[in-house]
Amino acid sequence: MANVSIRKYKNSDYETVNFLFVEGTKEHLPAACWNTLKKPRFYFIIIVACASIFMCTSSYVLSLTSLVALLAVGWYGLYLEFHGYASRCQREDMLDIENSYMMSDNTCFWVAEIDRKVVGIVGAKPLKEADDELFLLHLSVARDCRQQRIGTKLCQTVIDFARQRGFKAVCLETANIQDAAIKLYEAVGFKKSLVAIPPFLLNQYTSFTVIYYRYDIKS
């Protein structure tokens, strides 16, 4: 196993950090699509739509074309959700990481390195709703460096930071399609606190849910 070191973010890390963040966000799109394809409701909609078009036109070509169009629209809708999230973050806290995370005692951003190459990232800042709870966000590890406990070390770094700063808990959110992330957080010791349905247009067909986790820090 490679020697992994965790250190605080520097401005010279920006391009690599941004790449890991965007790639880590985009890679969930196939899982979201597959999750949608497994839902009976989705197949019901497809069958009804194609059957209706065939009954109106008696054309197999138009029916198949409508099937392809529906799949394309569904994929594009999911793409817009993930792309929109990444773009929004790049306009907000990820636009200037130094200013967003490194200028306060209670916020921080870390990178994981192997042989001086940045292979993982994570950030932490207090929750707006509860200033005694720290929010873990933007955890991402390069694909070719997984299964080396890098995610675990980054999570533990945030927990240690929270404990040193006197926070009562570390909170985070993930999605039901992120199986690896869920296993990681639960292995570290995070407990599920809430499951919510996000209010985006296609969610009634995708069964996409947001899972909130909490790690209580013992005093």
UniProtKB/Swiss-Prot annotation:
Function: Plays a role in regulation of gastrulation, possibly by controlled reduction of cell adhesion which is necessary for optimal cell motility.
Record-stated family: Belongs to the camello family.
Pfam families with a match to the protein in the record: Acetyltransf_1
Origin superkingdom: Eukaryota
Subcellular location as annotated: Golgi apparatus membrane
Membrane spanning stretches: 42-62, 64-84
Protein name: Probable N-acetyltransferase camello
GO terms, molecular function: N-acetyltransferase activity
SUPFAM superfamilies per UniProt: Acyl-CoA N-acyltransferases (Nat) (SSF55729)
Keywords: Acyltransferase, Developmental protein, Gastrulation, Golgi apparatus, Membrane, Transferase, Transmembrane, Transmembrane helix
Boundaries of every N-acetyltransferase domain copy: 62-218
Main location: Golgi
GO-annotated cellular components: Golgi apparatus; Golgi membrane
